[in-house]
């Protein structure tokens, strides 16, 4: 076990505070509409330019182990805020740094850290209650677009794309953000369920111009195993031919005699049929086939359930109004599944999303949820250069999460004003002792910092701006740093999602309170590099060169 270095008390807190300040100074410059960019060096490729607080925070790793611990704790605030609300990472970092700085001063002055923490917790509870009380529900598309615009640093085009996407796929639908190959940013909405498997054979194509299979009012056979023998399929094929409807087969694979027969029948025109490989692998494939079965009102044919293919009847097949299959994707539109069954399945997937601890599983479950709940919207972000596209994609991601949060919990006036107004309500809080009162005062002071920093980034005097805002009692009255005017921020479209503001203060106070109550820090002592590459000194034991004269 390697040696450890231990720091105590004021020494520990000073080193930690230095790390917090370094991270805070790098992140705070990005806050607000006039926030600056930060350039991040990459080990390969061009440097990355971003205005996203959490992206900057994630890049920071300090050489001094003790300073690094402080920086990493505050980085956690930004990451947690991004995970929970998708935005507000810079605000959370500014709040955390302010609480830590003021708290460390109070501890150094001899106050009880645990009472300070209790005071901080009481203050945060009061602030959250005030935010929730003043929150306004989001209903119109204009308001959704405004939230997206603010979060994308004033880019109205991004706000409109997100508003359109949410209008088309609903608030629950999945919106994915990709990099486009062109200059333009575009929105594409895939209705119904789409999965990334195309036709097994091009001979199934019905629309030769688009190289696509298009089938209306089709039966859907969902089979878990491979299909290779024809005899097990025959009874079903005869029933489908008599019905006169097309048939789509989704199976692990279709090969050999079965595939040859289907292709021949398709070419001769006796049977409208197409075969597709099942999406996913293993247990996820079973779950996705079950989703398709519920969506189309059919049954997944599986040996686990004791159903054999030769015993399948027409009423066990799914139905869909339209099925489109191209080389890479299959889309099922308007399946005939019962609404109650689909809703029950959606509720089941939501429960699994809540329980899972894996980010990958959560992402896959959310995709499945969206496919059942009404479609997927894809925003393709364009730009002139790769650096520009990446920077814009960051902002679209932020804006999308913020918009979701706004729909969930409502909106508040932006520009740090909601926190500033909440700070006024902390003056009357009753505490058990003076140290707890100081804890409340620390939070009250910290709540003015986001508004102050937004003004500073716009080249104004933060203290003057904050003072002028607090002179007026109107809740939404604040400073628009984009235009340099005061007024009603909500009517100007400067708004923040309640969830983003709430999560920012809760996470900031949680981590800051832990840092304030820290009394000792332990870090590994860096190993001294001898520079000899592991060989013993003195040339690694090689003898003299024995009379080798040159």
From Swiss-Prot:
<keyword id="KW-0067">ATP-binding</keyword>
<dbReference type="GO" id="GO:0051085">
    <property type="term" value="P:chaperone cofactor-dependent protein refolding"/>
</dbReference>
<feature type="binding site">
    <location>
        <position position="51"/>
    </location>
    <ligand>
        <name>ATP</name>
    </ligand>
</feature>
<keyword id="KW-0413">Isomerase</keyword>
<protein>
    <recommendedName>
        <fullName>Chaperonin GroEL 2</fullName>
        <ecNumber>5.6.1.7</ecNumber>
    </recommendedName>
</protein>
<dbReference type="InterPro" id="IPR018370">
    <property type="entry name" value="Chaperonin_Cpn60_CS"/>
</dbReference>
<dbReference type="GO" id="GO:1990220">
    <property type="term" value="C:GroEL-GroES complex"/>
</dbReference>
<keyword id="KW-0963">Cytoplasm</keyword>
<dbReference type="GO" id="GO:0009408">
    <property type="term" value="P:response to heat"/>
</dbReference>
<dbReference type="GO" id="GO:0042026">
    <property type="term" value="P:protein refolding"/>
</dbReference>
<dbReference type="Pfam" id="PF00118">
    <property type="entry name" value="Cpn60_TCP1"/>
</dbReference>
<feature type="binding site">
    <location>
        <position position="415"/>
    </location>
    <ligand>
        <name>ATP</name>
    </ligand>
</feature>
<dbReference type="InterPro" id="IPR001844">
    <property type="entry name" value="Cpn60/GroEL"/>
</dbReference>
<dbReference type="GO" id="GO:0016853">
    <property type="term" value="F:isomerase activity"/>
</dbReference>
<dbReference type="InterPro" id="IPR027410">
    <property type="entry name" value="TCP-1-like_intermed_sf"/>
</dbReference>
<feature type="binding site">
    <location>
        <position position="496"/>
    </location>
    <ligand>
        <name>ATP</name>
    </ligand>
</feature>
<keyword id="KW-0547">Nucleotide-binding</keyword>
<comment type="function">
    <text>Together with its co-chaperonin GroES, plays an essential role in assisting protein folding. The GroEL-GroES system forms a nano-cage that allows encapsulation of the non-native substrate proteins and provides a physical environment optimized to promote and accelerate protein folding.</text>
</comment>
<dbReference type="GO" id="GO:0140662">
    <property type="term" value="F:ATP-dependent protein folding chaperone"/>
</dbReference>
<comment type="similarity">
    <text>Belongs to the chaperonin (HSP60) family.</text>
</comment>
<dbReference type="InterPro" id="IPR002423">
    <property type="entry name" value="Cpn60/GroEL/TCP-1"/>
</dbReference>
<dbReference type="GO" id="GO:0005524">
    <property type="term" value="F:ATP binding"/>
</dbReference>
<keyword id="KW-0143">Chaperone</keyword>
<dbReference type="InterPro" id="IPR027413">
    <property type="entry name" value="GROEL-like_equatorial_sf"/>
</dbReference>
<comment type="subunit">
    <text>Forms a cylinder of 14 subunits composed of two heptameric rings stacked back-to-back. Interacts with the co-chaperonin GroES.</text>
</comment>
<feature type="binding site">
    <location>
        <begin position="87"/>
        <end position="91"/>
    </location>
    <ligand>
        <name>ATP</name>
    </ligand>
</feature>
<feature type="binding site">
    <location>
        <begin position="30"/>
        <end position="33"/>
    </location>
    <ligand>
        <name>ATP</name>
    </ligand>
</feature>
<dbReference type="InterPro" id="IPR027409">
    <property type="entry name" value="GroEL-like_apical_dom_sf"/>
</dbReference>
<dbReference type="GO" id="GO:0051082">
    <property type="term" value="F:unfolded protein binding"/>
</dbReference>
């Amino acid at each position: 076990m390697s040696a450890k270095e231990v720091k105590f008390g004021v020494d520990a807190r000073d080193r930690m505070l230095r790390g917090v300040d370094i991270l805070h100074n790098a992140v705070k410059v990005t806050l607000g509409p006039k926030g600056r960019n930060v350039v991040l060096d990459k080990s390969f490729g061009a440097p990355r330019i971003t205005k996203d607080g959490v992206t900057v925070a994630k890049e920071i790793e300090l050489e001094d182990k003790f300073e690094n611990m402080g920086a990493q704790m505050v980085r956690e605030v930004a990451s947690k805020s991004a995970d929970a609300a998708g935005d507000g990472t810079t605000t959370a970092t500014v709040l955390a740094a302010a609480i830590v700085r003021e708290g460390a001063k109070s501890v150094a002055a001899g106050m009880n850290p645990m009472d300070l923490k209790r005071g901080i917790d009481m203050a945060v509870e009061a602030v959250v209650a005030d935010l929730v009380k003043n929150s306004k529900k989001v209903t119109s598309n204009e308001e959704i677009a405004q939230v997206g615009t603010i979060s994308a640093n004033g880019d109205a085009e991004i706000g409109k794309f997100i508003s359109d996407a949410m209008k088309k796929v609903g608030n629950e639908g999945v919106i994915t953000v990709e990099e486009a190959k062109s200059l333009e940013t575009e929105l594409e909405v895939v209705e119904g369920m789409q999965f990334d498997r195309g036709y097994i054979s091009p001979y199934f194509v019905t629309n030769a111009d688009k190289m696509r299979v298009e089938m209306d009012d089709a039966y859907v056979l969902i089979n878990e195993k491979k299909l290779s023998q024809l005899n097990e399929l025959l009874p079903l094929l005869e029933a489908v031919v008599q019905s006169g409807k097309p048939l789509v087969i989704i199976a692990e694979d279709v090969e050999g005699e079965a595939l040859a027969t289907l292709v021949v029948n398709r070419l001769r025109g006796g049977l409208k049929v197409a075969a597709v490989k099942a999406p996913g692998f293993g247990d996820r494939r079973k779950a996705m086939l079950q989703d398709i079965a519920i969506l189309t009102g059919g049954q997944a044919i599986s040996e686990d359930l004791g159903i054999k293919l030769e015993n399948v009847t027409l009423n066990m097949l799914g139905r869909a109004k339209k099925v489109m299959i191209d080389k890479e994707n299959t889309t099922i539109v308007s399946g005939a599944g019962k609404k109650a069954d689909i809703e029950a399945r959606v509720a089941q997937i939501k429960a699994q999303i809540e329980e899972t601890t894996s980010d990958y599983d959560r992402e896959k479950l959310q995709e499945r949820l969206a496919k059942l709940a009404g479609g997927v919207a894809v925003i393709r972000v364009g730009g002139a250069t790769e650096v520009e596209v990446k920077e814009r994609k960051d902002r679209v991601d932020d804006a999308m999460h913020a918009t979701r949060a706004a729909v969930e919990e409502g909106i508040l006036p932006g520009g740090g004003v909601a926190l500033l107004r909440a700070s006024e309500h902390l003056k009357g809080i009753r505490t058990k002792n003076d140290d707890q009162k100081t804890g409340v005062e620390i939070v009250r002071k910290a709540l003015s910092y986001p508004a102050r920093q937004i003004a500073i980034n716009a080249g104004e005097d933060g203290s003057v701006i904050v003072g002028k805002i607090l002179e007026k009692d109107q809740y939404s009255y604040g400073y628009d740093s984009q235009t340099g005017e005061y007024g009603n921020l909500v009517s100007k479209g400067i708004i923040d999602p309640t969830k983003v503001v709430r999560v920012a203060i809760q996470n900031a106070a949680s981590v800051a309170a832990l840092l304030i109550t820290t009394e000792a820090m332990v870090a590994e002592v860096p190993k001294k590099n001898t520079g000899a590459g592991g060989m013993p000194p003195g040339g690694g034991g090689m003898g003299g060169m024995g009379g080798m004269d040159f």
